[in-house]
């Protein structure tokens, strides 16, 4: 005779050993963000976007997707360059020391709606500088 004994909620959904190292890492990341301050991070991202977005919008052959007002933009800029596949743009930028993501970014319905096969996506965070932009 076999029988099962079910634990009470929420423990019955725990399978095996909890990710202890992950929990410790998450706590350290939260401490790091609290030390810097989320408002400081947001202001830093906005400073970079306010600098770079207008420059990209003025570049011939570059299409920037998203709000044109830097104040309404997040720390991510998606773009395409006429006549060059985004994967090729990403490869060329990588060769110059710039890391961007190219592809559909798990948003295929949006790419179909935009009528593009993919975009390049540059993202900025607290460790990026204006000089890098």
Where are these regions (language model features)?
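Pyridoxal 5′-phosphate
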Residues: 1-133
């Amino acid at each position: 005779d076999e029988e099962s004994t079910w634990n009470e909620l929420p423990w019955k959904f725990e399978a095996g050993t909890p990710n202890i190292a992950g929990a410790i890492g998450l706590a350290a990341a939260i401490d790091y963000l609290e030390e810097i301050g989320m408002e400081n991070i947001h202001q830093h991202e906005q400073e970079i976007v306010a600098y770079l977005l207008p420059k990209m919008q003025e570049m011939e052959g570059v299409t920037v997707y998203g709000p044109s007002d830097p104040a309404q933009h997040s720390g991510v800029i998606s773009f395409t360059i006429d006549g060059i596949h985004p994967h090729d743009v990403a490869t060329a930028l990588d060769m110059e020391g710039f890391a961007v993501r190219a592809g559909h970014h798990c948003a295929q319905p949006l790419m179909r709606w935009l009528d593009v096969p993919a975009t390049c996506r540059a993202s900025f965070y607290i460790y990026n500088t204006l000089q890098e932009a």
